[in-house]
């Protein structure tokens, strides 16, 4: 793998750190870009302070939310629709994907993730 681009993604889970970029010594140049995404990375022990690839202020990271509330409907059942309390609402790039996985238009105010948000009942 020589490059990776992530746009409108949610990296979330049960751990404090759910996102890592790791380089292999002698692996060559690796280009990456993470934009308009929400990343769970709560480094409570400051274990990754000296790793430049995980400096979320560098230019490889653009318009991201760090440690936001995804507010998934039912992640234990793989239902990753986001609800009205999600920090991902209206934060995505509409140019990347004009529709969500259900075919709902997302050109005006797109949400980060695979689905536009809904109001849970």
Model-derived features: positions:
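Surface beta-loop-beta hairpin patches that serve as ligand-binding interfaces in beta-rich domains
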Residues: 78, 83-121
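Predominantly extracellular beta-rich ligand-binding scaffolds that present long acidic/polar faces
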Residues: 1-79
